[in-house]
């Protein structure tokens, strides 16, 4: 159907066009819409090469097996400010500038992690378990284009305000090997924007809808995935701190069955459904501390990351 085909193309374009956000952090820029890499200030300052180190509460995100390195009850929270502009030039030379719906995306992506070493808290009957729960925005986008831009009939605004709730446990088998297991509960929250995936465009005319109408397609759902991880420490110094760490993490894909509406100038035109897949992610890293004493330490870490974007190659509305 022409209406469905038009919105299928528009919604897929909205996810692709939001790639060029600028992150105000010492982190790498990646054209991996809509994935947000930096999920803690310390890890972002190291270019997100943190899978092997994973020794603060953000291990809950980067490598949950690393939570066994923590003692007592620890928390970490923060935010990442996303701003800047997106420049687009069409094959005909037409240009357009997009932004984040203002100078800085608001509300910005944020993260909260709470981690408890159960033995340190007096629950020795549970063995070498560490439990944690976190909340962050590992996927998301927010992009606005002018209503008179060259592709206004495809997109003028898009937002994907996803929230990930992460109940997680880790187990220390011995001083060399730890494992982690967790859930990723993805949902759309009213704390972040309108609480649904949203894309707007200007209608070119036809199908009984006046030309120039502001069109909106939206949808929401809650879904879940899982993650498994390990941390291997073959060498330690005399203080028991790692000199070599090897970390591996697998995050499963998660599938949304979105339900929402087509709107024209704020009035509902039809219901809408779509399937949207968050990709599986494989991460691995090796960290080496050539120097690690009570006075100073120096770490080298090399991480690899594979994201299976082919799983969301198509988006049918």
List the predicted regions and their residue ranges:
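N-terminal secretory signal peptides that target proteins for export/translocation
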Residues: 1-9
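Bacterial N-terminal signal peptides
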Residues: 10-25
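Short linear sequence motifs
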Residues: 15-17, 43, 55, 179
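A ubiquitous, low-specificity "background" feature that marks scattered single residues
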Residues: 23-24, 62, 69, 181, ...
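N-terminal, post-signal peptide beta-strand-biased segments of exported outer-membrane/organellar beta-barrel
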Residues: 27-131, 135-137
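Outer-membrane beta-barrel porins/channels
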Residues: 30-47, 107-317
């Amino acid at each position: 159907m022409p209406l469905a085909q038009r919105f299928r193309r528009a919604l897929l374009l909205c996810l692709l066009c939001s790639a060029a956000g600028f992150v105000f952090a010492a982190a790498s820029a990646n054209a991996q819409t809509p994935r947000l890499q930096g999920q803690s200030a310390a890890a972002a300052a190291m270019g997100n090469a943190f899978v092997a180190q994973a020794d603060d509460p953000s291990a809950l995100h980067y490598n949950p097996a690393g939570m066994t390195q923590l003692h007592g009850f620890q928390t970490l929270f923060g935010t990442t400010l996303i701003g800047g502009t997106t420049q687009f030039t069409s094959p005909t030379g037409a240009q357009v500038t997009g932004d984040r719906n203002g100078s800085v995306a608001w509300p910005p992506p944020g993260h909260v992690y709470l981690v408890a070493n159960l033995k340190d808290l007096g629950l020795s009957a549970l063995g070498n378990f560490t439990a944690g729960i976190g909340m962050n925005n590992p996927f998301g986008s927010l992009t606005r284009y002018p209503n008179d831009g060259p592709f206004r009939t495809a997109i003028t605004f898009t937002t994907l305000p996803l929230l990930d709730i992460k109940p997680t446990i880790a187990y220390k088998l011995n001083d060399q090997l730890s494992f982690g297991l967790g859930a990723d509960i993805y949902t759309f929250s009213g704390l972040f924007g309108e609480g649904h995936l949203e894309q707007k465009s200007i209608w070119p005319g036809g199908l009984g809808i006046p030309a120039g109408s502001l069109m909106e397609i939206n949808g929401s759902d809650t879904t879940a995935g899982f993650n498994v991880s390990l941390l291997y420490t073959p060498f330690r110094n005399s203080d028991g701190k790692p000199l070599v760490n090897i970390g591996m993490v697998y995050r499963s894909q998660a599938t949304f069955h979105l339900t929402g509406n087509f709107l024209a100038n704020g009035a509902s035109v039809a219901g809408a459904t779509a399937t949207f897949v968050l990709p599986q992610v494989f991460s691995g890293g090796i960290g080496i501390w050539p120097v690690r004493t009570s006075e100073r330490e120096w770490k080298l870490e090399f991480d690899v990351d594979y994201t299976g974007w082919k799983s969301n190659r198509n988006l049918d509305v």
